[in-house]
Every structure is written in structure tokens, then in C-alpha cells.
């Protein structure tokens, strides 16, 4: 990995094992093909009924879903839940520039692809396994735009997405290049515009 993700994963597992009794299995890819590729591999290997995806910097607590369950926000009619930093009940701590960049990207995604989801880029997402397997098997993008492709794939299958509040804290360990990555993502968004789903 060219970024610090492997070291972050190793550190997280060590800390997690110290404080919890949950078993963790690390799946290592031979090559760094991007976040989308890593998630696709993880979903393929997952065994339980629900699959949670999240960013390794833990901007959102791994156990945020417990708060959702406590508030009875998980319903049978929904199979996919997206953490949303724009939700009115979310608590978000991030720098001003990242906030502005996020707003611009959200506007572009909505304008170009007619997507109504307000926060496609929050990495904290919960899927029913059968849905995750179906959608991730069709995923082609491995970069930051993979989140947008997931929404389009879900939309094509008429699978509803429910956006839920999160407590989100910006971590400086993020591998996002604030100059180059948004450009690549915009190109990816326009390419998705002309793809059939």
C-alpha cells in the first residue's frame, strides 16, 4: 500500500483485540488496487447476515450501528444504510476546507447523475449480505468514485437506501489528496453518466 492503511489496520487490530473478544480476520490483497477493490474482496469473504464497511481511520466509531439499533432506526423494509454527515442529527467535526470540498462534490454528483443521496462519500455503510454481494460483484470503479457507483447500482435494482446520523471526527491520517483526488473523482462521475446500469 502506498498510503498508511496497512499500518493503521495493524494498529487498530492490536487495540481492538486488547479491548474486545470479537474475532478478526485480515485479508491481504496482493496489490493495492484502491478502496473499492479492497471492499469488494472483503464483502466476498464476509460470512454473516449483515456487512459493515467503514474507513480505517475510524472517523466514525465502529460501533455507530449500535446507536442506530438503540434508536430503532434499523427497519425490515431497508437493506442498506448509509452514514450521513449531512443528516440533521449528525455531529460532525471537520476542517472548513474539507467541508467546502464535500459540498462541491455533493452538488456535482447530484447535478450530473441526479442522485438524491446527500452524502455518498461517508465510508460508514451497513448492508444486508445478499444485497452487498449482489452490488459489489458488479462494482467496476476502485477509486473514491466507487461510492457513487454503488448508489447507481442500488438505484438500478430499486433497492432503497436510508441515510442515518453519525458522529464524525476528521482524522489527519486520511490519504485523500485534496488537489488531485477530487479531479479524478469528477472525471469518474462524468464517465458514470454515460454508463448503462
Which role does the model predict for each range below?
Residues 22-24, 29-45, 50-53, 62-144, ...:
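Acceptor/aglycone-binding surface of glycosyltransferases and processive sugar-polymer synthases
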Residues 7-10, 40, 152:
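Active-site phosphate/pyrophosphate- and oxyanion-stabilizing loops and adjacent acidic/basic residues
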Residues 115-116, 142, 151-169:
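Catalytic donor-sugar/metal-binding loop of nucleotide-sugar-dependent glycosyltransferases
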Residues 9-17, 72:
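Conserved hydrophobic residues forming the short capping helix/wall of the S-adenosyl-L-methionine
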Amino acid at each position: 500500500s502506498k498510503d498508511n492503511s496497512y499500518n493503521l489496520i495493524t494498529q487498530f487490530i492490536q487495540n481492538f483485540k486488547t479491548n474486545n473478544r470479537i474475532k478478526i480476520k485480515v485479508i491481504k490483497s496482493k496489490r493495492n488496487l484502491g478502496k473499492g477493490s479492497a471492499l469488494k474482496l472483503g464483502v466476498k469473504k464476509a460470512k454473516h447476515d449483515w456487512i459493515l464497511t467503514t474507513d480505517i481511520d475510524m472517523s466514525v466509531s465502529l460501533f455507530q450501528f449500535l446507536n442506530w439499533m438503540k434508536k430503532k432506526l434499523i427497519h425490515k423494509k431497508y437493506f442498506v444504510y448509509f452514514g450521513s454527515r449531512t443528516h440533521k442529527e449528525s455531529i460532525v467535526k471537520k476542517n472548513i476546507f474539507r467541508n467546502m470540498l464535500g459540498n462541491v462534490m455533493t452538488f456535482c454528483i447530484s447535478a450530473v447523475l441526479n442522485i438524491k443521496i446527500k452524502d455518498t462519500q461517508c465510508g460508514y455503510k451497513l448492508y444486508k449480505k445478499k444485497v452487498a454481494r449482489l452490488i459489489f460483484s458488479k462494482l467496476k470503479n476502485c477509486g473514491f468514485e466507487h461510492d457513487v457507483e454503488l448508489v447507481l447500482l442500488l438505484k438500478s435494482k430499486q433497492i432503497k437506501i436510508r441515510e442515518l446520523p453519525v458522529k464524525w471526527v476528521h482524522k489527519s491520517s486520511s490519504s485523500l489528496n485534496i488537489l488531485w483526488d477530487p479531479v479524478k473523482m469528477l472525471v469518474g462521475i462524468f464517465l458514470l453518466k454515460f454508463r448503462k446500469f
